[in-house]
Regions:
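Conserved alpha-helical substructure of the radical SAM core
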Residues: 2-135
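Radical SAM enzyme [4Fe-4S]-AdoMet core and its adjacent flexible, acidic
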Residues: 2-9, 24, 36, 57-58, ...
């Protein structure tokens, strides 16, 4: 998979939730809830606030299951059908009660986990899946050799390619970290940008929220 293909796959992962939101009494409801369940991370990336320890220190602070129970209950009251993403600025697999957190948040929506993959094993993938995770997002920072490693791990856990995405994040700043910007609503024309339907409503300003 080339960088462009990997990036497009990642954009497709979110586009359905950005473009198809619930509208309640004429007001769009958020469709993408990013939850920062832990302040722990085992890496320091140059494009993350954690690169400056004075600004964002590594702390052993973890969201409680009592709080995630409350979040899940309030989302149920809204008949929420978007996505919940366990990510934020921490490494979610470092949460000491990660399986309980996942089980607490499991519901009639997509439940993703975004991870650097350092703590993943075939067994932990199986346990996370059984607890309620239905999509894995792995950011690979060490090199292209990680692709085969993680593909084998997920396949050994019984998951197909529709249950995970491997994002190439091992690029440096000169290569924009392997990321590709969107066309910013049609005002940027660098590279080949797909045409968009300008007559459709835009929910981008309201689709996402973060809970910390």
């Amino acid at each position: 998979m080339t960088i462009t293909e990997a990036t497009k796959a990642n954009l497709r992962r979110k586009s359905g939730f950005v473009d198809n939101v619930q509208v309640i009494d004429g007001v769009p409801l958020f469709s993408w809830v990013d939850i920062n369940i832990t302040e722990l991370c085992n890496r320091t990336c140059v494009f993350c606030p954690r690169v400056d320890e004075a600004l964002y220190p590594n702390q052993n602070l973890n969201m409680s299951i009592k709080l995630t129970d409350k979040i899940a209950s309030e989302l149920a009251e809204l008949n929420y059908s978007g996505a919940i993403i366990l990510s934020g600025f921490g490494e979610p697999t470092l949460h000491p009660e990660i399986y309980g957190i996942v089980s607490s948040l499991s519901g009639p929506y997509r439940l993703e986990i975004v991870t650097n993959g350092d703590k993943l094993t075939t067994t932990s993938i199986e346990n996370l899946t059984n607890a309620g995770i239905n999509y894995f997002v792995v950011s690979m920072y060490d090199g292209a050799h990680q692709r085969e490693y993680f593909e084998t791990m997920f396949h050994d856990a019984g998951l197909g390619e529709d249950a995970f995405i491997l994002r190439d994040r091992w690029h440096d700043g000169e290569d924009d970290f392997g990321l590709k910007l969107t066309n910013r609503a049609g005002v940027i024309h660098t590279g080949q940008q797909p045409e968009i339907n300008v007559d459709s409503p835009c929910y981008y300003p309201a689709y996402s929220m973060m809970l910390d």
